[in-house]
Amino acid sequence: MTRSEALFEQAKKTIPGGVNSPVRAFNGVGGSPLFIEKADGAYIYDADGKAYIDYVGSWGPMILGHNHPKIREAVLAAVHNGLSFGAPTELEVQMAEKVIAMVPSIEQVRMVSSGTEATMSAIRLARGFTNRDKILKFEGCYHGHADCLLVKAGSGALTLGQPSSPGIPEDFAKHTLTAVYNDLDSVRSLFEQYPTEISCIIIEPVAGNMNCIPPIPGFLEGLRAMCDEFGALLIIDEVMTGFRVSRSGAQGHYGVTPDLTTLGKVIGGGMPVGAFGGRKEVMQFIAPTGPVYQAGTLSGNPIAMSAGLAQMEALCEEGLYEALSAKTKRIAEGFKAAADKHGIPMAINYVGGMFGFFFTEQEQITRFDQVTKCNIEHFRTFYHGMLDEGVYLAPSAYEAGFLSMAHGEEELRLTLEAADRVLGRMKAAM
């Protein structure tokens, strides 16, 4: 038994399922999860001392790589001044100014402590501002675990939502409408059915929780137009894509202006953090300037602000995003080339520092229903093969992969050579 396996058995005695977030349990791929002891650059090291090239990056935040010296130094300097004050700090002001400078649609921003808190608060604000109850989300898009967001259409995209997790009252679920990602007709049908009741659309501009699905041309623009037509707000959930797809997020990359934006992951530099911001007219509706209540004991935590500021400043380096995109393209297209070489059907998607691959004969994946038809057994086999080769991918066929600036030529080469060997063994076993 490895030390990771022993720790997992020990953890299951005191922690539900042995983990503090379900995907970490490896249920999607089988086997026992790795327990991580440390990380540096492009590598993580498990409890048994084995190194892995990491394409999870703490699920997105580590865009500069693990244990980046500028972030580490900023955190250590902040720690000397105290861990939390429960009062305003200059760091919060600096972070707000940095976010606003990088994302043109954001005129004011409120810091919180998680992505879930950000989306939950943005939706409450949208409901309060519009005085409407219903929200519209998309099948396969994840926006955190707030009750109103853990909802999926029960018998099709145009039906009232049904709870997708026990513990969510149907009275909550009925206000959440679910449309089909990359399908404007499904959105218009809902607006025509509830023309004055929908407060907002919330969307992952690049869906990263059904693997990696970019928007088709015109989709985000169509959502913006429909929100304007029916008086709803457009919330772009950039918890995952913010400052990862481009310096101004996915909204900057695709040229779409939302009313509200949610952020997280990258803006914390690896610390727990979230934020929501947007038009001043809307943001002024939040307490203490407006009637919509939102608060948080650790919001704007000085350690998180210090880490986030250090990372955000580093991301302003000229040419960084072009280099990151080139690395991502090389990995995604390299996986596809290796699969083609061995006669294993595969489709790929990638944008900025995000990528996805699908074991499927479908040429292009643009919707959630297509993702569910992909070969999960092939993914599991590939996953464990790559893990044995020292490459750590997301342990689920429904999660995106992430590159960092710490992934260099050697890491990319080693990863693609490993993929070639694993896919070759898979073909030989078929």
From Swiss-Prot:
Its cofactor is pyridoxal 5'-phosphate. InterPro entries: 4pyrrol_synth_GluAld_NH2Trfase, Aminotrans_3, Aminotrans_3_PPA_site, PyrdxlP-dep_Trfase, PyrdxlP-dep_Trfase_major, PyrdxlP-dep_Trfase_small. Keywords: Cytoplasm, Isomerase, Porphyrin biosynthesis, Pyridoxal phosphate. One of its GO terms (cellular component) is cytoplasm. It is found in: Cytoplasm. One of its GO terms (molecular function) is glutamate-1-semialdehyde 2,1-aminomutase activity. Its EC number is 5.4.3.8. The keyword Chaperone does not apply. Pathway: Porphyrin-containing compound metabolism; protoporphyrin-IX biosynthesis; 5-aminolevulinate from L-glutamyl-tRNA(Glu): step 2/2. GO terms for biological process: protoporphyrinogen IX biosynthetic process. It catalyses: (S)-4-amino-5-oxopentanoate = 5-aminolevulinate. It is an enzyme of class 5 (isomerase). The modification N6-(pyridoxal phosphate)lysine is found at K265. Homodimer. Belongs to the class-III pyridoxal-phosphate-dependent aminotransferase family. HemL subfamily. HAMAP family: HemL_aminotrans_3. This is Glutamate-1-semialdehyde 2,1-aminomutase. It comes from Shewanella sp. (strain ANA-3).
